[in-house]
């Protein structure tokens, strides 16, 4: 875990909001593939990515119920209003790439991969709305200070407020820059909590996907540096605020 370093990893399950550890329960869903297996879902989904019900496939009996990666709008975060189904943690499919119809168990779905005709792409999703997750703070801007969860530890922090996801963007003074996609070697997500993109006036919106409830408990996740300044790229504990099984709540109004 790279605390204090710009290394977003999506949503990582930690515990339950009702107390105790995460139970490791997941449910099985599907990723879209046509009958021939040559037209499949065209966006990669990585472990830690938030997912939704596919709004296209859900309208047809043959295609439902399939999932899609959450529609992240880093530039206009108030557009992130779709209820979250859960968090993707891997998939299983029959690949035709080698010509031997191999069963592939993967931490990520490779966009548009071909599968055996008539087979289904299984996706495993943490869909419990009570799960508490670990996520890293970052920013879509080129300003390092914008990657801080607070500008003044004594007077300014954003706990119990609502936030959007971010992916990519950010550069310049961010070292390293935000990755624009998940890691195809490890299968890990590159999604982060978009701190600066979610303006104070929007952090009360019940439709935003994330609610912050505290710092991730780890000795390495240090809020302040040696000079007493707030560090960037902190890890936070969050819940899914706007969930398919639970209506989102308003964030606390900033003082």
Show where each model-derived region lies.
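Surface-exposed, low-hydrophobicity beta-strand/loop segments enriched in small/polar/acidic residues
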Residues: 1-255
């Amino acid at each position: 875990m790279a605390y204090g370093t710009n290394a977003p990893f999506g949503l990582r399950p930690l515990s339950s909001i009702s107390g105790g550890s995460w139970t490791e329960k997941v449910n099985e869903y599907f990723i879209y593939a046509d009958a021939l297996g040559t037209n499949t879902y065209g966006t990669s989904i990585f472990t830690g990515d938030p997912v939704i019900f596919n709004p296209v496939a859900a309208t047809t009996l043959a295609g439902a119920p399939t999932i899609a990666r959450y529609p992240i709008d880093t530039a206009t975060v108030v557009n992130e209003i779709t209820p979250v189904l859960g968090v993707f943690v891997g998939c299983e499919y029959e690949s035709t790439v080698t010509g031997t119809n191999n069963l592939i168990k993967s931490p990520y779905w490779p966009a548009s991969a071909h599968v055996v005709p008539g087979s289904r792409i299984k996706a495993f999703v943490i869909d419990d709305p009570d799960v508490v997750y670990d996520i890293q703070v970052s920013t879509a801007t080129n300003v390092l200070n914008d990657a801080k969860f607070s500008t003044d530890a004594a007077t300014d922090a954003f706990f119990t407020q609502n936030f959007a996801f971010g992916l990519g963007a950010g550069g310049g003074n961010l070292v390293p820059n935000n990755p624009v996609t998940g890691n195809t070697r490890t299968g890990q997500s590159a999604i982060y909590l978009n701190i600066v993109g979610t303006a104070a006036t929007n952090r009360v919106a019940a439709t935003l996907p994330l609610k912050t409830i505290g710092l991730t408990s780890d000795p390495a996740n240090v809020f302040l540096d040696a000079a007493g300044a707030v560090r960037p790229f902190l890890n936070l504990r969050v819940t899914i605020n706007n969930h398919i099984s639970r209506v989102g709540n308003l964030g606390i109004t900033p003082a």
